């Protein structure tokens, strides 16, 4: 009888949950819009720097930020490893009624974020020039890269704490505070960039200090939250890292971390290929590195929107899949894919019609600079109109419990297809090979995503019939 009552309560709970009954399109908009805003604000850190550095310092400044970007990617990997892993385990333990264990996991995650940030900052400062050489810096770019990275390294502990800690803040039922933390840092960076670069004449060092101050502000707000406003129970002793907690944190954060590390590897390999083959072309090494840095930031805006749509769809996919409402799962997937495809089409036409204007936002350069940048934007991003399918499908598989396939899907474009192609194609086509590797990798990732998605959606349709 007890089990029957419990089952009835679960059914009633499912029936009343908006995720299972509200119109799917409205639900996606409700969840996706805040996620898109959060992703765009986070992307603005790098984009704003790139714009003002391009306008105030020039092409070599843009190249320097591109060379330095793997440091940020690795820092993000650590933040997601500990932040997502900590937040996920916190929610699981709270759901199981283990409040003390949940708080201990949160404490271990927070202290580990701070420690990992300090360690990464020390490593970057100790091995600054060798790392920048590894990341693709040329002799002309190196002074700018040293100035920029040597300063931004001091902000790494606060950056990692803010990015990772915000996941724990959201898990503590404070999503608005989490969004404010991110936005405050981005706003401060946006205000200080032109002041420091142009007003004080500090050049690329000014951009670096603006970034650090913004990161410190976000990090301090996270610290203030857990000192003053937290809802969870968290004593000082819980901040001492425990190995047993760290293991479970890493287990759930590893997928996101691997994806970021893979991106860092692709960035490093790409920079070095551009440096080598650029030196053997009319463009030289610096122009390709600078241009690719600019265009990667442009692409970040597009990807932020698609990832935001994916994140907004995750609870809808997961809840309805668990409730066996497969028609709503398929409908939510179609809506998400359609939304991303519409956005992708808009970006595609902008890339093809207005390449000069887009590149010009990030500063001026020689005729060769614009020639390479415009060709790269039009060719490398030619398959943009299907590029929203892969991130949506990756999140889709993860949300319905197919985590391994989700990880594979997330790695298809950058690692499985793009990485070998940017190594092989230039052997036969020189620097142009890098450009053509992009659309081929995009097309292959798109086809693979569609094949697996159709297969899984077909299984759901069959299950409904049965």
Description of each model-found segment:
Residues 35, 39, 51, 55, ...:
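Transmembrane alpha-helix boundary and packing residues in multipass membrane permease domains
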Residues 30-49, 151, 162, 185, ...:
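Transmembrane helical elements of multi-pass membrane transporters/channels
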């Amino acid at each position: 009888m007890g089990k029957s009552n419990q089952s009835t309560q679960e059914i009633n709970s499912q029936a009343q949950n908006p995720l299972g009954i509200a119109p799917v399109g409205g639900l996606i908009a409700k969840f996706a819009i805040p996620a898109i805003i959060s992703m765009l604000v986070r992307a603005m850190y790098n984009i704003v720097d790139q714009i003002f550095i391009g306008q105030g310092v020039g092409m070599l400044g843009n190249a320097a930020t591109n060379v330095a970007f793997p440091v940020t990617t690795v820092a993000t990997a650590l933040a997601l490893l500990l932040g997502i892993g900590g937040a996920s385990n916190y929610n699981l333990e709270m759901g199981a009624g283990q409040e003390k264990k949940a708080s201990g996991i949160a404490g271990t995650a927070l202290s580990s974020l701070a420690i990992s940030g300090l360690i990464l900052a020390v490593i970057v400062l100790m091995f600054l020039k060798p790392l920048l050489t590894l990341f693709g810096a040329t002799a002309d770019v190196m002074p700018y890269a040293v100035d920029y990275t040597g300063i931004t390294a001091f902000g790494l502990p606060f950056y990692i704490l803010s990015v990772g800690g915000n996941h724990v803040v959201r898990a503590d039922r404070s999503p608005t505070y989490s969004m404010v933390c991110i936005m405050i840092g981005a706003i401060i960076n946006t205000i200080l960039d032109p002041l420091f670069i142009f007003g004080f004449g500090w050049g690329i060092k000014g951009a670096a200090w603006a970034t650090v101050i913004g990161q410190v502000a976000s990090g301090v707000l996270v610290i203030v939250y857990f000192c003053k406003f937290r809802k969870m129970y968290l004593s000082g002793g819980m901040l001492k890292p425990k190995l047993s907690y760290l293991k479970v944190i890493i287990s759930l954060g590893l997928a996101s971390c691997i994806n970021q590390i893979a991106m860092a590897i692709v960035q490093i390999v790409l920079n070095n290929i551009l440096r080598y083959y650029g030196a053997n072309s009319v463009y030289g090494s610096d122009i390709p590195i600078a241009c690719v840095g600019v265009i990667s930031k442009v692409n970040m805006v597009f990807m932020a929107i698609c990832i935001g749509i994916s994140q907004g769809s995750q609870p809808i996919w997961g809840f309805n899949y668990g409730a066996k409402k497969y028609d709503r799962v398929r409908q939510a997937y179609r809506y998400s894919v359609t939304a991303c495809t519409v956005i992708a089409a808009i970006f595609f036409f902008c890339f093809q019609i207005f390449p000069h204007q887009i590149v010009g936002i990030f500063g001026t350069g020689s005729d060769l600079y614009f020639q390479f940048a415009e060709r790269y934007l039009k060719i490398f991003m030619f398959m943009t109109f299907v590029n929203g399918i892969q991130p949506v499908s990756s999140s889709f598989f993860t949300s319905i419990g197919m985590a391994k396939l989700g990880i594979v899907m997330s790695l298809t474009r950058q690692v499985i297809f793009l990485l070998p192609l940017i190594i092989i194609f230039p052997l036969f086509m020189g620097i142009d090979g890098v450009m053509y590797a992009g659309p081929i990798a995009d097309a292959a990732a798109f086809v693979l995503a569609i094949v697996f998605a159709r297969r899984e959606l077909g299984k759901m349709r069959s299950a409904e019939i049965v």
